[in-house]
């Protein structure tokens, strides 16, 4: 499985979430789903993982996201990075 991960610092989480949910870059058409987490130390630091069927789909979406300018409204702490699942262990 392929995913795109990134870490952002937002000014207002509720406003960010509203824009994210409006899906301005077409995430729902390209991806299988996503997981979003917030830092307990700073709830305006957001971690997002978006899951895709393939590395190619993840890379294409990452490129579209970067080109869209959607990230210009936030502070990017970790740039959108395409990753491949290596191991998933449950304890």
Say what each PLM segment does.
Residues 1-91:
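Short S/T/G/P-rich N-terminal loop/turn motif that feeds into the first structured element of a domain
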